[in-house]
């Protein structure tokens, strides 16, 4: 959800002067249209395995080009670590489009760093959202001179945030009892153990209410929460609006968590997720070293419990909250919006970057080939294993024609996105010409006829 939160902050800043549209492969996009009044389109990601990698690249390109033509968009802004080949191909197919890479800093030294130069050359501009921990950034983007640095981006805005009382009413909480927010993931066993260790650190906090954004259960439905906690699972979007409800927070050290909880002055323990490109440990160390938050050792379950327990001390909470008042303003959303608007109002140089694009695609194919060889043996071992021990309840994608829909009701959109039926989402107010073009794109991608569904 990190890119969605940043994109939402930028889109909200653009609304007075432009018509921003958010496109994403994340299911969380279902929350945005009705709650923020921003038009959105969901695109099924490559991980759905509904088509080959090469076909998906072309599908993404065609979806973006069709949306640009429908809306007369001037700029495509990509927020992520690796710009998809389909995104770059869309820019190359229509040189009148300007492509901006919103490239977050604090990268770990992962293989993606080797093609940073080629990727940068395909962009019309690169913007780095500021990070309060930037002085601890020693990753591959930290020394590059190809980006414009802005202030940090956050959906939390003091002027929009609900008061403590109103926020608690919105979440259905007792107004007088303490509340702790826990935003840690579940899934693999090590991640689950961290969730349990963090919750154990809250035991003994008198009258505490614990709010989680997802149920604390493993993949088999077994509870990860210790006995004795009053736990409630609550979904509220955007969560930044109700942060004043909380007396304490336990969160992964992702960009959004840090730049929402700390500006809201929520006393927080950070438990880093070391997977992926984001250097969460560097961010957590900075927050701890300068007194803005507490860092738990993500590799030590006992330390997680011990560190979280410190939040039960009102003096610790008061100290952390007061320190967070010193943080700089998180005005990066408006700054990025200004950059995008300026680019949109200046005529584009109509030249495709064909040579650089070809080099980048060649490198991408080489990387895929290396991964393919490395994974081939593992895949065959896995196939033999799965033949001997088949899945008991394998879910298959329904091979029916794709369904087109333009619902913006979160529950309906969530259900369509998560279903096994191939779902094609349309922006609100789509023209008949756009519908027809999208039908052709779907036929090329899936090879079936399509059905239309409207709510």
Predicted regions and their residues:
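Short N-terminal targeting/anchoring amphipathic segment
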Residues: 65-83
